[in-house]
Amino acid sequence: MLARYRYLATPLALVAAVILVYMENPWFFPKAGTTENLVATVAFWVLTVVVLVLMFEDRKSPGAEVVDVEGPAFTRYLFSNTRAGLFWLPIRIFLGFEFAVAGWHKLTGTGWIDGGGALLGYWQNAVKVPAAGQGSPPITFDWYRSFLQLLIDNHAQGWFGWLIALGELAVGVGLLLGVLVGIAAFFGVVMNMSYLLAGTTSVNPVMFALAIGLILGWKVAGYYGVDRYLLPRLGVPWRAKVVIPARS
């Protein structure tokens, strides 16, 4: 049913981009907590989801299977050649180890899965806004500060601590074993970006950049792992089936 509205993806994406510029512009963006702020934020995310759905439907359009923009030889090698699996292997192991250890420490330590006290303290420090002339706040974007404040107000640290700990462990194990590397790296990027938005730098920028590389090289990054056998069996389920006309 949505296929007939595929042509709306581009104009809706432009509208979402305009709203994003409006939201992040210090001269225009309304203060956090106002109705205007809420409407702009909700509109942006609704449009983003709609555009993604329409883009997914676009794979069914005529000619979608034959559009192929050829890239430079080195990118084809890094992202499509199985020999590049050796290049991605140490990166995958490094990231997997970092995520797995971080998740394990949260599961076996205190303050994360036993009520989320450590996580609550982290959130409370992140949302603080110092007085004028006393430095910059940890969080740059008001919408992310509002999101963390919403979690604090709803006492979400209990279940969110479990979510972070298990998520980090799952990403780590997936990368170490080479299981669905692209998906594991994507969720790793989401967690790294969340820490960066909250004002925590540490190793997150490095891990973020390396995980982006694994996402781009998802076809071969897990070649020396389970993906070598798993991906050929799974195929790519999001790709539209090619209909071959019968011979007359």
Where are the language model's segments positioned?
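Extended, low-polarity transmembrane helix blocks
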Residues: M1-G167, L177-S248
